[in-house]
Design a protein with these regions (language model features):
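N- or domain-start disorder-to-order transition segments that initiate the globular core
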Residues: 357-385
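Edge strands and adjacent loops of beta-rich recognition modules
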Residues: 342-363
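Long, His/Glu/Asp-enriched segments that create or flank divalent metal/ion-associated functional microenvironments
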Residues: 145, 149-153
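Flexible, low-complexity linker/tail segments at the boundary of structured domains
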Residues: 59, 542-543
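An aromatic/glycine/proline-enriched structural segment found at the starts
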Residues: 65-121, 230, 234-239, 323-343, ...
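Extracytoplasmic/secreted cell-surface and envelope-processing proteins
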Residues: 74-78, 134, 312-315, 425
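M16 family metallopeptidases and their MPP-like homologs
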Residues: 1, 13-41, 63-69, 119-140, ...
Length: 557
C-alpha cells in the first residue's frame, strides 16, 4: 500500500523536491534526507520488527491527543475515552522528541532541479528568519502577527496581479507571503513564489525579487492597507455571522492544529471581538515595521527552482543567478504608487422596472415576472445567516454558432471577463470591491449562457450592480487579452511533456467523437483567437435579459 502511494505521488514535482532537499537543507540536515513518506528502499526492505519498534517508541500517551467533534453526550463520551485510553501506560524512559533546527546561511543557497515532465518554471525565493516558538503562540502578540501576515499577503497579491495583467507579463502567476521555510516548521521565511515559462525565467525571478525588496524597503501605502484591512474584517465578520453553521470538520481541524502546533483556539466570538478592537488600532506604519523586519539580503537567502528539462534551453548557472539578484539589490527601487479610482461602480443607476406578476409555488419559492420579461425565482432560507446565492441562465449558448468558430467559442467563458467591467480593469475592479463579500462569474456553455455568484445581505446592492454591468458593460481590453494570451502560451508550451495531457486528450476525443468544442486549447491555436469576435459573441448572448431566469436563495427577503 505504501509503495503504491509512493509510486502514484512520484510525479515531476516529487522527483524535483527530492533533488532540492539536500541543497536547501545542506550539511546533512535531517530534512535533506527524505520526504515524509520515506525512502522507497526503506519501505520495501525494512524488517517487521522495525515497524513495531517505531510504534512502541513514538505512539504513546504523552505524544497523542484525541479530538472528538459531533452530536453526542459530552459526559458519556468523556467517560468512554477515559475508560479506553487511560489504561495505556506511559513508557519508562521514553525517547525524547526533538525538533530539527534549520541553521542560518551566510552565502546565498541556489538549488536548481530539472525534470522532463515539468511543464513550467516554478521558483521560490526565501529570506529565512526565526519563527515564533510554539510556547509564545498563546500571546496577544501572536494574534497581531497572524493579522499582519494576512494583510501583507493580500497587499502583495494585489501588486503582483497588476504586473500579471501587463501585455507582456513577467510571470504567469506569483505570490509573496510570510510562511514556513520550505517544508520545515522550525524556521520562518519571507517567501516569493513565481511561475513562468523557461524563456521568461530571468525576467520572472528578478521581477519577483524586486517586488520583495520594494516591500522590505518601502512597505505598503495607506490606501493598500485600508483595502486589505477591510477585506480581513469582512472575512472575520462573515465567519462570525455563520458561526451557528460551523461544521464539525472545521472545529476538528482547528483543534488538531492547536494540539500539533499550539495554534490558539479562542473561538470565533473572541476572535471577532479582537479583530474589531485591534484592526482599527493597527496603523500601516506598524504593519510596515513588521514587514521590514522579515528579510535581509546579507544572509539567509535561498532560491529553489523547479525547471523543465528542455533540449536547447540554457538556464543561468548558480553564479549567474546570484549575480542577477545582486544586480537587483543594487537598484534604486522606487516606492509603489497605488493608483486608485474614486469613481463609483456605476455612475448612473438605470431606470427602475416593475414586477408585472408574481406567483407562489408549493415548493416554497416565489416566481416574479418583470416588466422586461425576465423571470426571477426567490426563496428565503435560514441555512446560512450571511449568504445569498445567485444564478441566472438562458437557453442558447454555443450551439447557436457554426462549428467553424469552435476556437473562439470554447474560450468565450474564460476570455470574455479578462477586460473587467465598465470603466474598471480586473485589478481596478478588485480595488473597488475591497471589503465587500461579493463574487460573480459569467459563462457561455454549449446550450445555455448564465451567471453565478454570491454575496451577503449587506452587499446585495453591489451584486445587483455587477449583474447589471455584466449585461450592459462588458469591457474590451486588448492589453488584458494580450496578457492572457502570453500566459496561455507559457502554460501550454510544454504541456505535451505531461503524460496526463496525452491521456486526457485521447479520452476527450473518444468521449466526444473529436468534437472541436470539447478538445483542449493547443499552443498553436492561442494566436488564432479573435478577441473582437469572442467579445461580439459574448455580447450577443447577453444582449437581452428578457429570456433569462434569475434565481436568488439564502438570507434575502
Amino acid at each position: 500500500v505504501i509503495t503504491e502511494e509512493w509510486r502514484s505521488r512520484r510525479d515531476a514535482s516529487q522527483r524535483m523536491y527530492e533533488q532540492l532537499l539536500p541543497k536547501v537543507y545542506p550539511d546533512g540536515n535531517p530534512y535533506s534526507k527524505r520526504l515524509p513518506i520515506g525512502l522507497i528502499e526503506t519501505i520495501q526492505n525494512f524488517p517487521y520488527q522495525a515497524l513495531r519498534d517505531y510504534y512502541e517508541k513514538w505512539y504513546r500517551p504523552d505524544q497523542q491527543g484525541i479530538v472528538v467533534v459531533g452530536d453526542f453526550d459530552v459526559d458519556e463520551m468523556e467517560k468512554k475515552i477515559i475508560s479506553i485510553f487511560s489504561t495505556i501506560a506511559k513508557p519508562v524512559n521514553p525517547a525524547e522528541r526533538f525538533y530539527v533546527q534549520v541553521p542560518d546561511n551566510k552565502e546565498p543557497i541556489i538549488a536548481m532541479a530539472k525534470d522532463k515532465e515539468q511543464q513550467y518554471v516554478q521558483s521560490y525565493i526565501f529570506m529565512k528568519h526565526e519563527d515564533i516558538p510554539d510556547e509564545m503562540k498563546s500571546s496577544l502578540n501572536y494574534y497581531i502577527t497572524l493579522y499582519a501576515k494576512q494583510v501583507v499577503g493580500r497587499m502583495a497579491a494585489q501588486r503582483l496581479a497588476e504586473l500579471a495583467e501587463l501585455p507582456e507579463p513577467p510571470f504567469i502567476d506569483a505570490a509573496i507571503m510570510d510562511d514556513d521555510y520550505f517544508i520545515s516548521k522550525t524556521k520562518g521565511a519571507f517567501t516569493g513564489i513565481m511561475i513562468s515559462n523557461e524563456a521568461g525565467f530571468n525576467t520572472a525571478i528578478t521581477t519577483l525579487y524586486r517586488e520583495m525588496l520594494r516591500i522590505l524597503r518601502h512597505g505598503f501605502t495607506a490606501s493598500e492597507y485600508e483595502r486589505a484591512k477591510a477585506e480581513f474584517l469582512t472575512m472575520i465578520e462573515s465567519a462570525y455571522n455563520q458561526r451557528a453553521k460551523t461544521t464539525s470538520a472545521s472545529y476538528c481541524s482547528e483543534y488538531v492544529r492547536h494540539f500539533i502546533d499550539n495554534e490558539p483556539i479562542p473561538g470565533i466570538e473572541t476572535e471577532y471581538a479582537l479583530s474589531q478592537q485591534l484592526a482599527p488600532a493597527i496603523t500601516v506604519d506598524i504593519i510596515n515595521q513588521y514587514v521590514m523586519s522579515l528579510g535581509q539580503t546579507d544572509s539567509n537567502l535561498v532560491v529553489a527552482c523547479m525547471l523543465p528539462d528542455v533540449e536547447g534551453v540554457q538556464y543561468p548557472t548558480e553564479q549567474e543567478l546570484v549575480a542577477m539578484l545582486k544586480a537587483v539589490e543594487a537598484e534604486n527601487i522606487e516606492p509603489y504608487v497605488d493608483k486608485v479610482s474614486n469613481e463609483p461602480l456605476m455612475s448612473e443607476l438605470p431606470e427602475k422596472g416593475s414586477i408585472k406578476k408574481s406567483k407562489e409555488s408549493v415548493l416554497g419559492y416565489t416566481e416574479y415576472t418583470l416588466s422586461n420579461g425576465a423571470k426571477v425565482y426567490h426563496k428565503e432560507t435560514d441555512f446560512n445567516a450571511d449568504q445569498i446565492l445567485f444564478r441566472a441562465y438562458s437557453k442558447g449558448g454555443l450551439s447557436l454558432y457554426d462549428e467553424a468558430e469552435a476556437l473562439n467559442l470554447k474560450v468565450a467563458s474564460e476570455v470574455m471577463g479578462v477586460g473587467g467591467l465598465g470603466n474598471f480593469s480586473t485589478t481596478d475592479l478588485s480595488k473597488v470591491l475591497a471589503g465587500k463579500k461579493v463574487s460573480i462569474s459569467s459563462t457561455v456553455n454549449t446550450f445555455s449562457e448564465g451567471m453565478s455568484g454570491s454575496t451577503t445581505p449587506k452587499d446585495i446592492e453591489t451584486l445587483m450592480q455587477l449583474i447589471y454591468m455584466s449585461f450592459t458593460a462588458m469591457r474590451t481590453d486588448d492589453d488584458a487579452f494580450k496578457s492572457w494570451q502570453n500566459k496561455q502560451i507559457a502554460l501550454l508550451k510544454n504541456a505535451a511533456t505531461d503524460p496526463m495531457t496525452a491521456f486526457n486528450d485521447t479520452l476527450v476525443a473518444k468521449l466526444y467523437s473529436n468534437n472541436p468544442l470539447a478538445t483542449q486549447l493547443k499552443l498553436e491555436d492561442v494566436e488564432k483567437i479573435d478577441y473582437a469576435r469572442v467579445m461580439e459573441i459574448a455580447r450577443e448572448r447577453y444582449a437581452n435579459a428578457a429570456d433569462f431566469s434569475f434565481i436568488f436563495t439564502g438570507k434575502i427577503s
